[in-house]
């Protein structure tokens, strides 16, 4: 079994960013992204690690980066520790299976979300205003209903512990420049369409997903993670029923459990029972197998 990694500690490497899930180290020409087994819900990081989570996210990202490299360049160089610079080798046990050596890029100041179904914050806004990120939708739609066509709904990038905010495409063009925003929208919609079709053949609905892009030498590059259970809503096709919330292959199971608690959704996080940790791990592993055919 792969060891659970909650924190990384690499004294001779330069830590440049510690996110809710990933630790990023600067290796000079490249970055090293280490995906821990931390899990967050409602923007609060839980105390417990989820077995295999970092492995699952890394392997799924590699699968999609490789699959769609014809659409847009991506930042992934290798997930094999043997390909990493020599100074990383002492930490092989913590890096194996959960790390990516990546090219550097300047991240865009927005997150690029594509929605194919009415769920989450999109459903909440639609109920109140009949729109999603200002995009008008037909009246009378219900929760989890398929949209007439996928829509691009960017958001801001919030600091750790804060909430992202949905923004209009016009605001995205102000933040990124019109040409870059338009290119990011086109690429995101293209990748989503391909992934939706490939996943449908595997019995999975991609309800929505979040992309991050950066610029390298002035060219758009796909960065961060790729169509993982942390950045996407994956629903089992055979259980899909519009008109309510759906079972999923992501951390929605954990969110649903936390909703049953008397917790204000602020730190400190409540203690997670062993069965909830195990069931969450099983959800991630099922997503890995359904998408890639891999088992750890």
UniProtKB/Swiss-Prot annotation:
It comes from Syntrophotalea carbinolica (strain DSM 2380 / NBRC 103641 / GraBd1). Its EC number is 6.3.2.6. It is an enzyme of class 6 (ligase). InterPro entries: SAICAR_synt/ADE2_N, SAICAR_synth, SAICAR_synthetase_CS. Coiled coil: none annotated. Belongs to the SAICAR synthetase family. This is Phosphoribosylaminoimidazole-succinocarboxamide synthase. Pathway: Purine metabolism; IMP biosynthesis via de novo pathway; 5-amino-1-(5-phospho-D-ribosyl)imidazole-4-carboxamide from 5-amino-1-(5-phospho-D-ribosyl)imidazole-4-carboxylate: step 1/2. NCBIfam families: PRK13961.1 (NF010568), purC (TIGR00081). GO terms for molecular function: ATP binding; phosphoribosylaminoimidazolesuccinocarboxamide synthase activity. Keywords: ATP-binding, Ligase, Nucleotide-binding, Purine biosynthesis.
